[in-house]
Amino acid sequence: MPYKVQSSEKLRKSGADFETKAMLYLLNFREDSSQINYFVVDFFNDITGMDRMARKLWDVQSKASKTGSAKTIGRELVTLYKNHVSDFDFFTYIIFLGGVPDTFRIDAKQNVFQSTNITPKALKSVLSGLKEECTEKEYIESHKITDESLEKFLKLVWFVVDDKEPADYIKAIISNHPKIVSSDSELIAIFNEIRNKQSEKKNTIVEGVVIDHIDEVLSYGRHLTTSEIRLLVLQRIINSNPLERGVPTPFIEIVSKFPEEQRQSMIEQCQRSLCMALFNNSAAQGFWKLFEEIYTLLMKYPNRNIDFIFQRIDGVVIDECPNFDVLSLKYFIAKIKEGLLP
């Protein structure tokens, strides 16, 4: 059976900020974050994570309010439930919350939990709110709204209470290497750029669109990728696009020694290696650790050449980025130096 898009929306800034937090939660704060390659914006739900081959979906509904009642939270689950009873297979259901009532949780210290940590009274209200909202929606067939089905669904939902500032989500992308970006204002500026990029994805109209297979969602361009987000962060830090064509000025000293007929091939190989290193999900932490080390050395020795910086990088740190070889790492150093230093 096909899937029909209904109730896509445009948000105020506060809601947009919160959707960005929800997306960055998927990117960095789950044990299975490394499996997520695409972040689909306001198509299936506020945010839906998707793996590289469109076989797995992480469905997220966000609710920025910190004061909603248990019944209101139940109402907010309606789109997740709609997807649950659809013919598409969603791997995980998440509601990302700005806050919950004091009487909502059994253990108030848990910010990521399932229905087993919700008090019986609150859970009853959640169920009531969800049932009422489902009944009001024309896009959920009445025979699918049963207590048994709703209760089964609630056992699958993850409740995530946001306990972080925007800057914290960016720190997680750069793997908490504080030397890379020194101030929270810079981190917030990066967060805002990601938010704006995410909001741009809503400029197309998809209300009423029907798709037969999950992968068809990519045809509508309402997605960001893990790689795009990392690249955006890196661009902001070094004030340039590291994947841009051309030879960085500090690298010319190395290129000039290379046989002329082999130069273009060597440069292209360096660019490919940098691209693979940046987009290697399994080595993301090592990439940012290496970047921090290069960044620190360049700040300490701004007038020294690429070979000098290369010789002072810890070999253990280099080994954590298997996509680089000697020349491509020197190329990366040159790219960073060109962006950071006049």
What are these regions (language model features)?
Residues 12-13, 17-79:
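Catalytic centers of nucleases
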Residues 1-21, 340-342:
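N-terminal intrinsically disordered, low-complexity tails enriched in polar/charged
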Residues 1-10, 65-311, 325-327:
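Acidic metal-coordinating catalytic centers involved in nucleic-acid phosphodiester chemistry
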Residues 25, 309-342:
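Hydrophobic, glycine-enriched assembly/anchoring segments
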